[in-house]
Structures are given as C-alpha cells and as structure tokens.
C-alpha cells in the first residue's frame, strides 16, 4: 500500500500532493487558495516564506517533542497502552506516487498502528478548536489527517494540539 522512507523521495513539493496541500485543493485552507497552490506546483510562484512565518514554523518544530510527550502522558493516564513507532516518516501511495504524506508521529495505541499529528496553536486560534477531549479540530487539519490515513492505509489519526505556547 505505501512506500516508506525512500531516500530517493524528492523534497521538491512541486512533484507531489502532500497533506498540507489538501486543504488548499479543497478551498478550505486559511493560508492558501487553490490557485496559489496551482501556481506553486507549476513553478510560476514561490511560497512567501517571511521571517515571521519561518520563526513560527521553527517554534512549532521545536515544541513538537513536548507535544508528543504530553500526548503519550495523557493517553497512558487514560489507561491506554501507547508507544512511539516512528517520527516524521515520509510515505508515498504505492499506486498513486504523486500522493505523499509526512506523518508527525506513529503510535502503537492499544495494539493498533495509528497516525498522529502534532500542532502548536496561537491563542487567538483557540476558538477554532473544540472543547478539550472533543473530536473538534479545524477542517483544514482534518483534511490533512484524512490524506495521511489514505496514503498510509491506516484507520485512525490522533491530533494533539498545544494551544497558547506563543
């Protein structure tokens, strides 16, 4: 079903559709329109990576291990058996190689291999998330999760969000 961790897997995002592209394709991304994504994919436009955007992205990457640790702690506190299988692994759909996904966290949760997405959220965006413990997440993140499930062939994705770490 999937091809994992190929060293030949290109980092050239114009060559594939990744999880973060899906919301733009569906027209539900708060950051990018379908047309903007199209222009990036054909090389007619380059994503504007401002210093502020790079700083926010880097902070999220630094905090990701903390979010993982908090998630594992919460799952175990709730009586689940949870173990980390992999972090930031890249996958390509075997039949549709243009579909790729990088999974933040892979867990063995109560014996099932599941995907995990770690998010750090600005306090002003907290209203987009449901009550703690609910299944309410922003639609653009749900699309990313569904894409990852499709590419990996798994059936469950856990999203952990650290809200207000700014």
Regions found by a protein language model. Give the residues of each.
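Charged, glycine-rich intrinsically disordered N-terminal tails and low-complexity linkers that flank
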Residues: 1-62
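Intrinsically disordered, low-complexity boundary segments flanking structured domains
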Residues: 23-25, 66-70, 157-159
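Generic structural marker for isolated residues within well-ordered, non-membrane alpha-helices
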Residues: 35, 68, 145
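Nucleic-acid endo/exonuclease domains
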Residues: 52-56, 61, 65-69, 75, ...
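Nucleic-acid nuclease catalytic cores
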Residues: 73-103, 107-166
